Amino acid sequence: MKILILSFFLILGINLVFCQSSISLSATIYDQSPARNPDFEIPNAPNAVVKNMVLSTLGADKTPTYCCGDNGVYYNGQFDIHSQSTFDSWFHEIEGISYAVPYELVLIESKDEPGIYVYTSSSFFPIDGKGFDNKTLYPDEITYNGHNYHFCMKIHSSFTYHGGEYFTFAGDDDVWVYFDNNLLIDLGGLHTSASETVYLDNLGLTIGQSFPFDFFYCERHTYESNLNIITNLNLTCIEYDACGVCLGKNDTCCFVNKCETINRCLEADCNEGTNFQCDYHIKNCSDGDICSTDGCDIGFGCINLPINCDDGNYCTKDYCDPTYGCLHIETANCTECLETGCITVLPCFPVTCDSLNSSHCVASAMNCSDNDPCTSTECVNGECTYEWICGSEDSSSGVVDSSSGVVDSSSDVIDSSDIIIDSSSDIPIPTLSPSPQPSRFPTDTPTNTPMPPTRPPTPTEDPKIYEDPEDLDKDCLHCKDLGCILTGKSCGYLKNEKYEKSNCKENCCSHTPTCF
């Protein structure tokens, strides 16, 4: 009689176990992206199931243990997983790499076969618009083929073995299912839909005892996402975390409590220390660079722009040194104006500010004239040079100052009858020829000095700008650069007598503009 009563309650208990219309499995989905993890959307990925990518026993943290440390997993010479570092984010939340999102996977009892629970989807996209796919928080994130194709999902649960149970999975990509911490479904790799079934009667389990069930799934590549489950296991949860996830790690609490904000200048902490509530604080946008200004835009987030080192001095070169900060280097041959800096390129034509317009510069030829008709003057490299061009004759007194080479005359008119001619003298005989003869008298003035440039055209009554010479290089100074007409002056060109096009190197110009 006792045996009959026990059998009755056992059968009743089994029937009660399988009378529910659905099984809800709390899951954690870790959103990923190819830009953050190269294991996702691998180019030319092999279409094949790759076994032994994870160890056969579940890890101590209740996630699969990667097989190969820092080494990658290859199939036919192509990456399938890059390393332990890239694998870590598949089933763990790593800031900026993976994003934990809670999810409920609901298996529905079959109408035709009571006690059989089914989930079927050939378009499994559970987090479209969530995680990194949230365009409000991540407006620049790429959407692949209209869906979020890159994520991993884990489910922790348990079951009581009654005998006769089985579990069938079909889908893509990676799937690992552990029964009692042992890997029994191994469908790793990037592949189209693949399937496998586990019959629990073959596992040597004890009837009436409970065992852990751990399910891991990844979608890593477009263009398919299939997930299909058929089972008569009565999966239940023995413990939930603070966020309502079965055997979870509290890593979805921030998502549950809506810590997301459109204010990109705020950050939120959500952990045990905040009792899993959102604690907001201002984001630190400092990039540690003294050559940048740090700021934050509510819609964009941190903005780090180059610092402005302009000191308002047009005659300094301003830049930022990563060690010393802003530096200001003086520009050679520069005269500062109110609105610009005037830089002299040709030393004999110094550029200065226009006295009538502080936003313009004018170039003028250096004045080397000494008002002496017997000297020829010329500017060479910014210095005036002088050449004696008159004869060294005695005037009315017949006396020549040999120290200066200048004739000393006390009268305005030279009388030829007063000239004393000494044939033994080295002083040449004066001549009334209109062309002066070169002097043989020694002098300290330089010889063989080039003649000054030919004079520009005589100005007309109204100022004008003369046309550029055809052989004037575009990089040379032009009349349009001087602004002569603004001061009531014309602008013409002085020919460079030393100009030889074939021998030119840098700063070589056939003509030089000047105001007159």
Swiss-Prot record:
Region (Disordered) location: 418-465
Record-annotated PA14 domain positions: 109-249
Protein name (database record): Protein psiC
NCBIfam families in the record: Fibro_Slime
Leader sequence segment: 1-19
Key words, A-Z: Glycoprotein, Secreted, Signal
Subcellular location, record wording: Secreted
Matches recorded under PROSITE patterns: PA14
InterPro entries in the cross-refs: Fibro_Slime, PA14/GLEYA, PA14_dom, Prespore-cell_inducing_factor, S_mold_repeat
Compositionally biased intervals (Pro residues): 449-460
Sites where a glycan is attached: N134, N234, N250, N284, N333, N357, N367
GO cellular component, one term: extracellular region
Pfam families documented for this protein: Dicty_CTDC, PA14
Principal location: secreted
Family: Belongs to the prespore-cell-inducing factor family.
Low complexity composition bias: residue spans: 418-427
